[in-house]
């Protein structure tokens, strides 16, 4: 079909608008995030903005946030966690909306004594309510090398992956009354902070401040998502993550990780839910 000049121009405008709405950040910590707390404890480490560190001492932790908000997206980063005795520390990478009825999707790494594994804590909040925790002990030492952690959030599901391996899927079950984050745009956040009252063995192990400052590293930050601007998000479904689901191989890999490395699943906690586990668990 031959296009007129006017039709071609209109098509170009539509294409440019779609390209702006579905934005890919091949991540620069200089350009795409701001270190919003920590009083100098968060630092971009290289000229290209590919490596950032967050530190924690007895006075304060630190954190950064994305400049843009997104309504759906795929966010990933490589992290190397605090080595040695990290008891009482929490290192995070998560999505969150503002307000008192916020939505949130969490990767939280709970520190431990030397020689004991980190606990990877995942959770999903909708309208300020969470209580959907799954926890894992990783199959590697996350303090030795960088590993890739990814959150894929689309209208159908949320997928958590570690080094490309799915560890958790939280499906949209609004049809049976389970809230799902579909309406509130979120920013990407990362932080390193102290939570010795609960983070390690329920607060039994306290932070050894003689080991401070504690430092975690982030690199190769990347976000592909639907940018929220001027009260709306136009998001064409032309990117693989927007309709991503786990095929049979992905399901098998996820179940394998869960059977070997999952240490807590709210869906199995009958003591916590004596009247029956949440409906999405069945």
UniProtKB/Swiss-Prot annotation:
Record-annotated active site: 104, 108
Catalysis: reaction(s): breaks a beta-(1->4) bond in the backbone of a xyloglucan and transfers the xyloglucanyl segment on to O-4 of the non-reducing terminal glucose residue of an acceptor, which can be a xyloglucan or an oligosaccharide of xyloglucan
Residues the record marks as carrying a glycan: 112, 238
Disulfide bond annotation, renumbered to this chain: 226-235, 267-281
Primary residence: secreted
GO molecular function per UniProt: hydrolase activity, hydrolyzing O-glycosyl compounds; polysaccharide binding; xyloglucan:xyloglucosyl transferase activity
SUPFAM superfamilies membership: Concanavalin A-like lectins/glucanases
EC number: 2.4.1.207
One GO cellular component term: Golgi apparatus
Chain residues that bind xyloglucan: 108, 121-123, 131-133, 197-198, 202, 272
Protein known as: Probable xyloglucan endotransglucosylase/hydrolase protein 18
